[in-house]
Regions:
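A long, amphipathic alpha-helix that forms part
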Residues: 247, 251-276, 343-389
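Substrate-binding rim/cap in mid-to-C-terminal beta-strand-loop elements of soluble/periplasmic
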Residues: 90, 373, 406-463, 467-478
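Catalytic-site neighborhoods of secreted/periplasmic enzymes
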Residues: 87-246
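Histidine-centered active-site microenvironments of extracellular/periplasmic hydrolases
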Residues: 44, 300-303, 310, 374-433, ...
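Active-site-proximal N-terminal segment of extracellular/periplasmic enzymes that hydrolyze or transfer
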Residues: 21-70, 305, 543, 548-554
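Short, structured active-site-proximal loop/turn typified by the sulfatase FGly-forming signature C/S-X-P-X-R
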Residues: 43-86, 92, 125-129, 317-319, ...
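C-terminal, low-complexity/hydrophilic appendages and adjacent surface loops
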Residues: 412-413, 487-550, 588-589, 597-607
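Long, internal low-complexity/basic segments
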Residues: 21-24, 31, 36, 342-348, ...
């Protein structure tokens, strides 16, 4: 009997190992604040031209990747900010169904919380690893609220907490503390230069004034590297242009890719990280899922010289904007403009901001090429299939559209990205596909889970709000007629809905602290001016410059959208949670089923 039991155990282990090895390795790439029009392949697919509407871009490596599979050119984030967007991607759920609308320290203790897809993959036999910026803002209850690792990944290298913390990077900003204590004394900028020297200086102090020495250091840095700061907006120290103090192979994003390559090159063996820690490389006997999160082209926008030199003499079209457009905008939108102003820069500064942004994207393209080749080589060496999913921007980025350089808005430039999906199995994803259907970032989790063999149609995965992108492949069939999202940053709670013909947004909550779902119907019942409606007719105003919500012939249509969007985000499973507590939340279902993916607008109210 002992022999039989032992034989059974060994057999089961062998079967599990073979089954696990049949699962594809998965590389999920995410860039930050990345406009889809920084990709020539996207521009060609959408306009027939390689350049963006603003001008020259360069993306040969990403274009090659797109040619190997499918590019989804109408992909939308479900929240135009890093934390809630990444939380939505990680869970496959809308922000209004997770209670995650901004940079709250959410956690997994409340009863309604579901696992992230990376946690599910671990149960399916995967090793999960994250490099760079993951930052879904989903933590573990400590007990108590805090930055407690929830175990989304078995292996992690964070750009800030591992690399920059240990002196690896190029330029970064971080809080300063009194020596020998945790007393915050202000904020410092840190610079590493190619000659090996490091520099730091205060840009803000809690007490007293900044020293002349620090002012001189800052000025010298700005002059040497042609730094452009966002002096026309609320955060006037934000760097929106300049030259990286390090060469292309030494930037923080280059080091992120270097850490990935070290991990893949040292299978089951120890190696030294860039900051000198001893780590063990990937286990080729288990399927591997990697989240490669680039910090670029997020601010500080500092492309290395070899890329910046290519772009600095290009002339770009500055997006048209007139402050008169604000006259017909509600208070929330006016606050967004005031806090994120780009229009008051000089024409020369606007040119630099756009040049340096696209140059930074080109640097990212080169690094993505390196990472993809290293991942493919690992898969080939171990005779393993793969899936590569590239989320082009956790959200979008304005370069003057609506008068801002930022995200956070209800407009297309804040919310639109692209998704590229490539499989080594061409029967699943053929090469050279351009998919024009509306897809949302909540579709990413179901796609990755499906690729891993998870049966997402089972009842236990009913919580997933998205579709698998496999359902769209090589087809023109739409799965939805609109996309939705919500955010509570910069100007308060605002939700948006977008279809082929119309873009609508509205304020969803009063500007005051409320208990979970207190006055949840406020945005539907309050006077219409309090709901701060914005409506664009994309048939005639594709650049979203004229709010027609208050125009006489559009009022009924705006009211219809107010009810449609309001019932979706406020009454179809809306979660609001007091994240400072272990398990305090409320779920609003007064309009269950409202989010049906259908826009049945009465023809009589469409102008």
């Amino acid at each position: 009997m002992k022999i039989n039991v032992l034989t059974l155990i060994v057999t089961c282990c062998i079967v599990f190992t073979i089954s696990a090895q049949k699962k594809p390795n998965i590389l999920w790439i995410v860039t930050d604040d990345h406009r889809a029009d920084a990709l020539s392949s996207y521009n060609i697919a959408t306009t027939g031209k390689s350049e963006s509407a603003l001008g020259y871009v360069s993306s040969p490596n990403i274009d090659k990747l797109a040619s190997e599979g499918a590019i989804f050119v109408n992909a939308y984030t479900n929240s135009p900010a890093c934390g809630p967007s990444r939380g939505s991607m990680a869970t496959g759920r809308y922000p209004f169904r997770t209670g995650h609308f901004g940079f709250q320290l959410t956690h997994q203790n409340p009863d309604f919380v579901t696992p992230t897809f990376s946690q599910t993959l671990q149960k399916e036999g995967y090793t999960t690893a994250a490099f760079g910026k993951e930052d879904s803002y989903i933590f573990r209850w400590g007990p108590g609220q805090g930055f407690h690792d929830a175990g989304h990944y078995n292996y992690k290298v964070h750009f800030k907490h591992d690399l920059q913390k240990n002196g690896v990077g190029d330029f970064w900003t971080q809080p300063a503390y009194k020596k020998g204590s945790w007393k915050n004394t202000g904020t410092k900028e840190h610079i590493l230069k190619s000659d090996g020297t490091s520099h730091a200086y205060y840009i803000k102090k809690k007490e007293g004034t900044i020293s002349n020495e620090d002012i001189a250091k800052k000025t010298a840095f700005e002059q040497e590297f042609e730094i452009l700061r966002s002096y026309t907006r609320y955060n006037e120290n934000l760097i929106i242009g300049g030259e990286n103090p390090l060469p292309a192979n030494q930037t923080i994003d280059a080091k992120i890719v270097d850490e990935l390559k070290l991990y893949l090159a040292h299978s089951n063996t120890e190696f030294k990280t860039n900051w000198g820690a001893t780590r063990t490389g990937a286990n080729p006997n288990k399927p591997l899922m990697i989240n490669l999160g680039f910090h670029l082209p997020h601010t500080p926008v500092l492309p290395p010289k070899e890329f910046r030199d290519v772009f600095k003499n290009k002339t770009y079209n500055i997006p048209a904007f007139d402050e008169k457009e604000l006259l017909n905008q509600p208070p929330q939108i006016q606050r967004l403009f005031k806090n994120l102003n780009f229009s008051n820069l000089t024409p020369e500064e606007k040119q630099q901001a756009i040049q340096d942004y696209y140059a930074f994207c080109a640097h990212g393209d080169a690094l993505i090429g390196e990472a993809v080749e290293a991942f493919k080589a690992y898969c080939k060496k171990n005779n393993q299939q793969y899936l590569i999913l590239f989320t082009v921007g956790d959200h979008g980025w304005h370069l003057g559209e609506q008068g801002i350089e930022a995200k956070f808005g209800p407009w297309e430039k804040s919310n639109k990205g692209a998704i590229i999906v490539v499989s080594s199995d061409k029967t699943k994803i053929p090469s050279g596909l351009v998919q024009e259907q509306l897809v949302e970032y909540v579709d990413i989790a179901p796609t990755i889970l499906s690729a891993a063999g998870v049966k997402i149609n089972e009842n236990k995965y009913d919580y997933l709000d998205g579709y698998s992108l496999y359902d769209f492949i090589d087809s023109k069939k739409e799965q939805r007629e609109y996309i939705v999202g919500e955010i509570n940053l910069v100007a308060g709670h605002r939700a948006y809905l977008r279809s082929k013909d119309f873009a609508f947004s509205m304020r969803t909550r009063p500007q005051k602290k409320l208990s979970p779902n207190e006055q949840v119907k406020w945005a539907l019942d309050c006077p219409v001016e309090k709901a701060e409606l914005v409506l664009y007719d994309l048939r005639t105003d594709s650049n979203e410059r004229q709010n027609v919500a208050t125009h006489r012939k559009y009022r009924k249509l705006a009211a219809w959208f107010r009810n449609k969007l309001g019932t979706i985000v406020l009454g179809d499973g809306r979660v609001e949670c007091d994240w400072s507590e272990a398990n305090t939340y409320d779920i609003s279902n007064f309009a269950a089923g409202a989010h049906d993916g259908i826009l049945d607008i009465p023809k009589s109210i469409i102008p």
